[in-house]
C-alpha cells in the first residue's frame, strides 16, 4: 500500500476530529456542518477500503500535524494562505430540503463514476427542477455535496450524491451524472430544468 495514501488518510481523520470539536462547540455554519457529515461518510468508506482503524489513524494523524506545525513558521503560513485559491459554497437547497427523507415507488439506482444516481421511475408528466449544494473554485464546480430533483409540489423524485467509498469527483463526472438523471426522468415524459446556479457552474 502506498505510504502516502495511508498518511493522507491519517491526517484527514485528525482534521475531521478537529472540525467535529468545532461543531460540538456550535461554531460551525451550515456549509461547515454539511461538509462534516459528508466527510464522515467518506472517511468510513476509505477506512474500510484501506483496512485501517479510524481511531488509530486519528492519533497518528495528530502526530503528523503536530510535527508539521512545529516546523512551520508564521511567515510561511501567511504566504500559503495568501496564495491558496478560495472556494465558495453555493446552496440551491435549504438544510430541510437536503436532510429530508424520501421514498420511491419504482426505485432505480445507477452508479456513474464516483457518484450514485437514484430516481423514482413512477413519476410521470411532471415539471421537475434540479437543485444542488456544491462548492465552486475558479468559477467551476469543485465538489458536489448533494443534488436533488423536485416536483413543483416540492416532492423529491431523484438524487445524485457522492459515493463514500470513492471520494473525489470532477466537474465532468457531475455533468455526466446530471445527464443520466435528466434522461431517466424525461423518459417518462417529465419536463426537467436545471437551477440557474447549476446552469452557470456545472451544466
Curated annotation (Swiss-Prot):
Q: Where is this motif: Nuclear localization signal?
A: 34-38
Q: What is this protein called?
A: Non-structural protein 1
Q: Does the keyword Ubl conjugation apply?
A: yes
Q: To which species is this protein native?
A: Influenza A virus (strain A/Singapore/1/1957 H2N2)
Quaternary structure and interacting proteins, as annotated: Homodimer. Interacts with host TRIM25 (via coiled coil); this interaction specifically inhibits TRIM25 multimerization and TRIM25-mediated RIGI CARD ubiquitination. Interacts with human EIF2AK2/PKR, CPSF4, IVNS1ABP and PABPN1.
Q: How is it modified after translation?
A: Upon interferon induction, ISGylated via host HERC5; this results in the impairment of NS1 interaction with RNA targets due to its inability to form homodimers and to interact with host EIF2AK2/PKR.
Q: Which domain of life is it from?
A: Viruses
Compartment(s):
Host nucleus; Host cytoplasm
rRNA-binding as a keyword of this entry, yes or no, is no
- What SUPFAM superfamilies is this protein classified in? Ns1 effector domain-like, S15/NS1 RNA-binding domain
Query: Sorted alphabetically, which keywords does the UniProt record give?
Result: Eukaryotic host gene expression shutoff by virus, Host cytoplasm, Host gene expression shutoff by virus, Host mRNA suppression by virus, Host nucleus, Host-virus interaction, Inhibition of host innate immune response by virus, Inhibition of host interferon signaling pathway by virus, Inhibition of host PKR by virus, Inhibition of host pre-mRNA processing by virus, Inhibition of host RIG-I by virus, Inhibition of host RLR pathway by virus, Interferon antiviral system evasion, RNA-binding, Ubl conjugation, Viral immunoevasion
Q: Name one GO cellular component term.
A: host cell cytoplasm
Q: Which family does it belong to?
A: Belongs to the influenza A viruses NS1 family.
The domain section of the record reads: The dsRNA-binding region is required for suppression of RNA silencing.
